[in-house]
UniProtKB/Swiss-Prot annotation:
UniProt name for this protein: Uncharacterized protein ZK632.5
């Protein structure tokens, strides 16, 4: 066998000096241990090694030598499987340089290849040198044998002390010692496999060290890592008196959970993002990194509590359950406790993969509720502590973010607030939310009222900051809150002082990361304390008071302007005009209209001579009161009253008409139109005035004690104004009968204007015709008024009692006397 092996490796020349036992030992160990294994630890077959060798030839650009290599390996496979596998393993252990150089040199020396113009070509019909049907190798594998990398030598086991072991006792029976040897699991396993086996026999300390290291991702002699970075048990193992089967069963579930945890952590690493401005993502990633560090330090602490190692999370680790790994009597319980801790850690990490991977779907408020629920309902104690630590981190995050939003003008609001898109989608929105429809999510840990209050305060603070007046001067001369803070700049500077940091820290000190509490109001308590401690609440309250007072003045201006300004404005065309003319504005100022609010009035681009469509564009936050629908109602009030006023003026201009002198019937007709239009205008103004008095009574907060804040009173003000607008629309019957009443009034006014123009031009027939149209429209108007049981009594006097509508009823009266019923 030695001569055959020596010929295979060295050829004919060195047979004598190379017949050493070491090569034969390598051959034995390679075929016994099969040292080359795949990623799962399974030994590679000869076929797999051959495929690898062929790929290696391609990589080294040695395809020309493939016939030589294949010829040698085919003969070896046919003659001796052991030699064939031995050559494949030794060849795979050769370095690329040794393999390439030796293949070129030996194949040329054996005349298997020829070199022509620098290229190697296979010599046709050449055969390798053969002895006893074993070919000599065409390359040199001796470097791999000298380095001893192909296999490890079996360690020589010390001989057992058999001096005290007797097969038979004094009674002729099998002795107890010999019986225990025969029943030894290791011996039975060795006999079953037909060869000796190798296994670890560990004490408690060694076993726990290997086990804890595996769960932390650290390999050891017992637990190795394969090509897929999965742990596997390298050899059978027994722990003190435990046998191999017991230890294997215990370790199976530990290996399984360790690999699950390793995969989960790798998934987390893959979805971590470093270059991001998303603060909640950064906070969650930091939390998970800290949790992994706590997990490492906790297992180190379990193994050696007396170690003087300084942990980064000393207080947390020391408050976790302690495991007495030195007590051999409770080894099963300790292994189960370790498994439970790792399982708890894994399940929380797996939950976090979903959260971090879809972080945009989770708001801090929702995560806080999730973490609180987990801290109460998680099945394992360690999982409860992990959720509790996340809950505390989120409370700190939310409180710090709220403190930033309430003190910093350019804070990112969308980290805690969400855009509802429309204030109608918010339940009972505040005045500030109507301007900027942001809302804060409510949960088990923060009720809806507090969430709305916080969102409202943040939005109000932003409007306070943006208000030029609040930036340019203080609100008053009084001192309130911290450091006499009365404007946005002072508040922002105060937020950067150590005093402010101390305030926030005191609020958060009550939240203990090591305590397990059932109070879901922790976040609510911290937020309430924050709102009590920072000056923003008082600032926004005072700003709300200013807005409230300005709003009341604004309402007074709107009512006055839209019910009387038409008297003072000229009747020129309004096309393509967006603001009041300078002359008109000066005229209005002389009539006592507020100059600041007057600048907010302009003409709509659709405004005509008949329809004086006005727009109101007040600055924030007053613009919340005049939405498009509200502006339309105000504009229609102005248009209708202006039309009625114009019609009355046109009737007045017919007094000196010669047509009325000749046609007594027309004198009554114009008297009738005059009194009817005047009565309609009077009734409308009366209803508007009644609604306005009720509106002002609601806004008279000073005459009656009210415990509500200015912020809440603004909401009262908004709702009262909306009611006033509805009453005004009702006074003009704009919404009655699907809005047709307003159009009927327009037709009536048009008939009056046309009749007046015909009368002035001497067209008595035309004036009579337009009067008939007026009567027909009046009948329709009265029919619609009857449907309104509340306002109909005001218009009952306009009913035409008889078909006799000519001027004979007023035959002895002058037209000027008929007109005298008008009073302005």
């Amino acid at each position: 066998m030695l001569s055959t092996l020596s010929f295979l490796i060295h050829g004919e020349q060195n047979v004598q000096q190379c017949q050493t036992i070491s090569d034969l030992e390598c051959l034995y160990l390679i075929n016994k241990n099969q040292p080359l294994r795949d990623s799962n630890g399974n030994p590679l077959t000869a076929h797999e090694l051959t495929d690898d060798l062929n790929e290696r030839l391609v990589t080294l650009k040695l395809e020309a030598f493939r016939p030589v290599v294949s010829e040698v390996l085919d003969q070896l496979e046919e003659q001796d499987d052991a030699l064939h596998y031995f050559v494949l393993v030794a060849t795979s252990r050769l370095s690329d340089e040794d393999f390439e150089n030796s293949l070129k040199e030996v194949s040329l020396s054996q005349k298997l290849m020829v070199r022509i113009d620098g290229e190697y070509k296979y010599r046709l019909y050449s055969k390798p040198i053969v002895r006893n049907n074993i070919p000599q190798l065409a390359w040199d594998i001796s470097p791999a044998l000298r380095t001893r990398k192909v296999a490890e030598k079996d360690e020589i086991s010390p001989p057992n002390n058999t001096a005290n072991v007797y097969p038979v006792d004094d009674w002729g029976l099998i002795s107890r010692e010999f019986r225990s040897i025969l029943s030894c699991e290791e011996l039975i396993l060795s006999a079953r496999e037909g060869q000796s086996i190798e296994f670890f026999h560990l004490d408690n300390q060694g076993f726990y060290r290997n086990l804890l290291d595996m769960h932390r991702g650290i390999s050891s002699d017992l637990f190795q890592i394969d090509g897929d970075y999965h742990f596997y048990q390298s050899r059978p193992c027994r722990v003190q008196e435990w046998n191999l089967t017991t230890t294997r069963i215990i370790l199976q579930k530990h290996i399984f959970i360790a690999n699950q945890l390793a995969e989960a952590i790798q998934k987390l690493k893959n979805i971590f993002v470093t270059g991001t401005d998303n603060s909640i993502r950064l906070m969650m990633q930091k939390y998970l990194i800290d949790e992994q560090q706590i997990f490492f330090e906790y297992f180190e602490y379990i193994f050696d509590e007396s170690a003087s190692t300084s942990y980064n999370f000393q207080s947390i680790v020391e408050n976790l359950p302690k495991l007495n790994i030195h007590d051999a009597s409770c080894r099963f319980q300790i292994c189960d406790d370790i498994f439970e801790i790792v399982s708890a850690h894994y399940h929380v990490i797996r939950e976090m993969i979903q959260v971090v991977g879809n972080i945009n779907d989770y708001s801090p408020i929702r995560l806080n509720e999730m973490s609180f629920t987990g801290s109460q309902s998680a099945p394992q104690f360690y999982a409860k502590r992990m959720w509790r630590r996340l809950n505390v981190e989120l409370i700190r995050f939310i409180v710090n973010k709220l403190a930033e939003m309430l003190t910093t003008p350019d804070a990112e609001l969308m980290e805690l607030l969400t855009d509802a898109g429309d204030a109608k989608l918010i339940k009972d929105p505040s005045i500030w939310q109507r301007l900027n429809p942001l809302q804060m999510e409510s949960s088990l840990c923060i009720d809806e009222d507090l969430a709305n209050r916080v969102a409202d305060l943040i939005i109000g603070y932003q409007f306070f900051v943006n208000d030029k007046k609040s930036k340019s001067q203080k609100l008053d001369e009084k001192t309130f809150a911290k450091s006499d803070i009365q404007d946005a700049e002072e508040l922002e500077l105060f937020a950067k002082t150590p005093e402010f940091e101390i305030i926030i820290q005191k609020i958060l000190d009550r939240v203990d990361v090591n305590s397990v509490t059932e109070e879901s109001e922790e976040l609510t308590i911290c937020i309430n304390k924050l709102l009590e401690q920072i000056p923003t609440t008082t600032l926004v309250e005072k700003y709300s008071q200013i807005v409230l007072e300005k709003s009341i003045k604004f309402f007074e201006f709107l009512k006055l302007f839209f019910t009387s300004a038409y008297i003072h404005m000229r009747h020129s065309t309004f096309l393509n005009r967006y603001v009041l003319d300078t002359l008109e504005r000066e005229k209005m100022l002389k009539q006592g209209y507020d100059p600041v609010f007057l600048r907010t009035i302009g003409y709509n681009e659709r405004s005509t001579n008949e329809d004086s469509l006005l727009v109101v564009t007040p600055p924030e936050p007053l613009n919340v009161f005049v939405s498009k629908s509200v502006t339309d109602i105000y504009s229609q009030v102005f248009t209708v009253l202006r039309m009625l006023h114009t019609a009355l003026n046109e009737v007045l201009e017919t007094r000196n008409s010669e047509t009325l002198t000749r046609e007594p019937r027309l004198r009554y007709a114009f008297f009738h139109m005059n009194t009817t239009i005047f009565a309609i205008r009077k009734n409308m103004l009366t209803l508007i005035e009644q609604s306005y008095e009720a509106f002002m009574k609601t806004l008279d907060f000073k005459s009656k004690p009210d415990q509500r804040s200015s912020h809440e009173l603004l909401n009262v003000c908004y709702r009262a104004h909306r009611k006033f607008i509805r009453d005004v629309a009702g006074a003009l019957m704009l919404k009655s009968n699907a809005g047709t009443t307003g159009r009927i009034i327009r037709l009536m006014v048009g008939s009056v204007s046309q009749a007046s123009n015909a009368c002035v031009n001497g067209d008595a027939v035309g004036a009579e015709k337009f009067y008939q149209q007026f009567q027909n429209n009046l009948l329709i108007f009265l029919d619609q008024c009857r449907l309104d049981h509340i306002r109909y009594p005001l218009y009952r006097s306009l009913e035409i009692g008889s078909e006799e509508t000519d001027g004979r009823r007023s035959l002895n009266s002058s037209y000027s006397d008929d007109l005298s019923c008008r009073s302005y």
